[in-house]
Amino acid sequence: MFLLPRFILVSCIIGSLGFDNPPTNVVSHLNGDWFLFGDSRSDCNHVVNTNPRNYSYMDLNPALCDSGKISSKAGNSIFRSFHFTDFYNYTGEGQQIIFYEGVNFTPYHAFKCTTSGSNDIWMQNKGLFYTQVYKNMAVYRSLTFVNVPYVYNGSAQSTALCKSGSLVLNNPAYIAREANFGDYYYKVEADFYLSGCDEYIVPLCIFNGKFLSNTKYYDDSQYYFNKDTGVIYGLNSTETITTGFDFNCHYLVLPSGNYLAISNELLLTVPTKAICLNKRKDFTPVQVVHSRWNNARQSDNMTAVACQPPYCYFRNSTTNYVGVYDINHGDAGFTSILSGLLYDSPCFSQQGVFRYNNVSSVWPLYPYGRCPTAADINTPDVPICVYDPLPLILLGILLGVAVIIIVVLLLYFMVENGTRL
């Protein structure tokens, strides 16, 4: 009976030998209520249509292809679909949201609105866009695209002013100048409508600089007016530069309603597409995997800039992307990161995903889920099951009392026996 506490302690020490619970560099999920947004590296349909069907093209394990939890499109991204004619209707829903896309709009594509524009501005736009997407998908279950209907009472049509290579901007739309206007010093309006979603992410953009047309310089000025609430959202050009500027966008989160787009100078812009956010949920951080090229192409870090705790966990490989299918598809490091989608995990943190919820040598930063208690389990003389000192102290006291009782009893019986002899 008195050996039981000692037996428990010895069993605890033996059971803890060699155990560790470090954070792992993967994306995972607490349960089956998750969803992934991606590109060709997780586009199972694209692989099915290749000949032969070579799944080494993907970083995603093909066992997940029939899960119904993936919305991916080769050659595309959510940002690219949001702004340009090259469109894919990303649609998905889950408590735990994972993003592995963005590489299809990088400095490698060198997009800018005009020949004297700036791709740096578009990288800034990308970062601001994904910031809004990640923040809002931490509190919404559902993401999809919706068209935004608008009514312009003039005779002018939308124009493809902003284009580069194969990319043509169509969100927001530019309304061309009316034929009876001699310059761009005029005010013009258009109605647009948001309905059917809890909230929407829409673009509000201006050329932030002196826009030259026919020897005249113009300052862009754009506003959205909510006719139901009276709230005004606006941007005015503040820069005096005449080259090296581009289309600066802010990404507004708006409620349903009737809106008026207003231009006080230069061309009127009006949103044509929106991210539709639906089904509020309890706060659940999103997970983002860095979407980048092999080093032979220039990538950016805008998804990393956008993904900040506590609303987002960022995962990245420590090595260059080197694919096995081709140089940009099928990298072992990123395949390892996505392998966490094959199983449930109890705890997520800034450092990584914890496979167990008992103890770890690393204290989870910005933890979410059922997370372990930190303890120094790298010290070989200290078992992980004694990370809390109070049970150890109590156990020591009990062992001491047991030893004293045993000694007293032995002395008592020895004396008793000696007396009888």
From Swiss-Prot:
It is an enzyme of class 3 (hydrolase). Residues 1-16 form the signal peptide. Residues 267-379 are annotated as: Esterase domain 2. Residues 128-266 are annotated as: Receptor binding. One of its GO terms (molecular function) is sialate O-acetylesterase activity. Residues 7-127 are annotated as: Esterase domain 1. Disulfide bonds join 44-65, 113-162, 197-276, 205-249, 307-312, 347-371. GO terms for biological process: fusion of virus membrane with host plasma membrane. It catalyses: N-acetyl-9-O-acetylneuraminate + H2O = N-acetylneuraminate + acetate + H(+); N-acetyl-4-O-acetylneuraminate + H2O = N-acetylneuraminate + acetate + H(+). Belongs to the influenza type C/coronaviruses hemagglutinin-esterase family. Homodimer; disulfide-linked. Forms a complex with the M protein in the pre-Golgi. Associates then with S-M complex to form a ternary complex S-M-HE. Structural protein that makes short spikes at the surface of the virus. Contains receptor binding and receptor-destroying activities. Mediates de-O-acetylation of N-acetyl-4-O-acetylneuraminic acid, which is probably the receptor determinant recognized by the virus on the surface of erythrocytes and susceptible cells. This receptor-destroying activity is important for virus release as it probably helps preventing self-aggregation and ensures the efficient spread of the progeny virus from cell to cell. This is Hemagglutinin-esterase. The gene is HE.
